Amino acid sequence: MIQDEVPVSAQTIQWRCIESKIESKRLHYGRFAISPFRKGQANTVGIAIRRSLLGEIEGTAITYAKSKNVIHEYSTIIGIEESINDILINFKEIVLRSDSYETQKAYISITGPKDITAEDILLPPSVQAIDDSQHIATITKDITLDIEIEIQKDRGYRIQDSKESQAGEFFIDAVFMPIRKANYSVHSFGNNKKFQEILFIEIWTDGSLTPKEALYEASRNLIDLFLPFLHTEEEEIISDRDEKSESNGNILLSNSISTDIDRMAKEVAFKHIFIDQLELPARAYNCLKKVDVHTISDLLKYSQDDLRKIKNFGKKSVDQVLEALQERFAINLPRNKFSID
């Protein structure tokens, strides 16, 4: 049986990252394609993955701060521009990554004048500040600011009870949510005999983990959620099938890019990826835009000979396009309409 004749139910579902970019230290973006699904399956998976991304991914946050000679959170310290409340709000915004589930202690001991940022926090080895430039406070005089803080790893929100705190102690309402936003969409293709769906997932993170790490963790959490429903014998069968690469419809999170995924991505995904992702020089980019080449799908309609016929589009520009397509999408344009490289 040739590949195109394999039923959808017998094809291994696989995924690939079709777009990835770092918009800033605290904003990472990733777009993923997962397929093939039978009718209705993609929406089911999309809903579950999105909810898992938004509610089940663990994050790290500052949950407690302590400073001597401070009565309450609305106090001000002579020589510091911000009030204690402002400093606590700034602590809440600090993006951290931690490899430990234990409560970690960190310290700030800075003598002014100085602008205090996340870089000035003395963190334990297991904790990393994602953006060292995040502002905490500004010391305007020759005074020393000493603060002890606690860092924890959890998920969701945590509203602290400040009634139990003593003078100089401040419990911080923490947000353990590294996912800024998550969207999904489902696209259908094929005919009545072979109807398939492809799922696209978009993930924005705060930089404490990559979108790919977030997708893996969300998927793992969903799998763990269903494990109690499986018997030991069934788990052994699934394990054996995985070892023999004969699983039917199980989502395999691997980085391999199959021919099937490439073909479907060209038909659907590349229509939504703009040529900006190729990061071409201005000359080549502007020439393509002038002939209405806006997406990768538009570009794939051209052969190498077609590109050379574009006004002011020389050999160097063609080579730049070919190199970018190969590097980012593993695509080779044919030399002409009648050949395939």
Curated annotation (Swiss-Prot):
One of its GO terms (cellular component) is chloroplast. Pfam families: RNA_pol_A_bac, RNA_pol_A_CTD, RNA_pol_L. Keywords: Chloroplast, DNA-directed RNA polymerase, Nucleotidyltransferase, Plastid, Transcription, Transferase. It is found in: Plastid, Chloroplast. It comes from the Eukaryota. The N-terminal domain is essential for RNAP assembly and basal transcription, whereas the C-terminal domain is involved in interaction with transcriptional regulators and with upstream promoter elements. This is DNA-directed RNA polymerase subunit alpha. It comes from Angiopteris evecta.
